[in-house]
Amino acid sequence: MVGETQLQLARRHVREGRARVARQQEIVAELREGGYPTEIAKTLLVTLEATQRLHEEHLIRIVGVSGRPALSQS
């Protein structure tokens, strides 16, 4: 968003990434329960999880510089 600090942006990426991973996990489960192929959905989930790890590592690096708590809203 416009006017976000790097710390705010990193926190938002972590928050939104968690939601994406959770939703993709639901999709994989729904496909499996419905008897549909899950390979592509699982591949996307692996990619989202890897991206989430990068977001979290980035947040940790920023917090290390700022000295602020990682997931607080300030």
Predicted segments, located by residue:
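Anionic, Ser/Thr-rich low-complexity intrinsically disordered regions
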Residues: 1-74
